[in-house]
Amino acid sequence: MYTLMKADVLAQLAGLQQEISQLHDNAQQNQSHFVLLERRFSRLQSFNDEPQLQDYRLQLEHDDAVVKQIAQLRQVANAALCDYEKHQVCALCSPSSKTDDYLTSFNQSLQQEIKLAGMQMGEKVLLVGSGALPTTALVLVAKLGATVFCYDHDPAAQQLARQLVQSLGLEKQVQFIDNLKELTDRPVDHIIVASLVADKQALLAQLVPYVTRSSKLVMRYGNGLKSIFNCPYCHEVNCSHWRTASKPVTTGLYDLIILEPNHHA
């Protein structure tokens, strides 16, 4: 039975990869295809929870062929998602955009993060991997009156995000940095690392200079089948810079864990 299930899963993953790649190409020529692309993203998110996979989940997540196919699909899906977000920003910046609808549609996952990390009104938050569509930043401003620093390695995404923030008149509350060193001498209260940030373990050491002893870091990630649409993360127990401050929490979009600076480092 497992052999048949594995073959079916590999076929589904390969099919999704081909569909997303083709729709991504089409959307770059005709923007109406972004709607179809969004539906495929929803399919990716629901794939992880399909009932027929659950009995074989551990085997699938440790099968080299499945892991390889998931990595290939994630690369294609993430590239498409980045362009989809850029398309959404352009739409949101238009005069006819309904920004309130956009904000209210945000997933409840962030509310869990706010509670788990103990975020308070008016605090400073660094968002790593903010992307072209900085939903998290906008919600933190709306809910907590936070000051959010957005950092992303993609200059085009940063520029589009700036345009969106400017169109909303939130330049003071949502600021953009091109280098983490811009936060020197002004540490943040919290850090949120986006699920699509790839090398999370290496990033942690870079973030230490910009936090206080009481800061919390929210690490978003997805392992196993959930890594189809998220980059994986496994906390190293012997990490000298950070320690876990919560158990892993599962949300509809990704998993998350709260880290805090290791005071003994």
From Swiss-Prot:
Keyword Transferase: yes
EC numbers: 2.5.1.-
Keywords from the named record: S-adenosyl-L-methionine, Transferase
SUPFAM superfamilies: NAD(P)-binding Rossmann-fold domains
GO biological-process terms attached to the record: nicotianamine biosynthetic process
UniProt keyword annotation of Lyase present: no
Pfam families: NAS
Family recorded in the similarity comment: Belongs to the methyltransferase superfamily. CntL family.
GO molecular function terms listed in the Swiss-Prot or TrEMBL record: nicotianamine synthase activity
Classification of source organism: Bacteria, Pseudomonadati, Pseudomonadota, Gammaproteobacteria, Enterobacterales
Catalytic activity as recorded in UniProt: L-histidine + S-adenosyl-L-methionine = (2S)-2-amino-4-{[(1S)-1-carboxy-2-(1H-imidazol-4-yl)ethyl]amino}butanoate + S-methyl-5'-thioadenosine + H(+)
Described purpose of this protein according to its UniProt entry: Catalyzes the nucleophilic attack of one alpha-aminobutanoate moiety from SAM onto L-histidine to produce the intermediate (2S)-2-amino-4-{[(1S)-1-carboxy-2-(1H-imidazol-4-yl)ethyl]amino}butanoate. Functions in the biosynthesis of the metallophore yersinopine, which is involved in metal acquisition and thus enables bacterial growth inside the host, where metal access is limited. Therefore, this enzyme probably contributes to Yersinia virulence.
Protein name: L-histidine 2-aminobutanoyltransferase
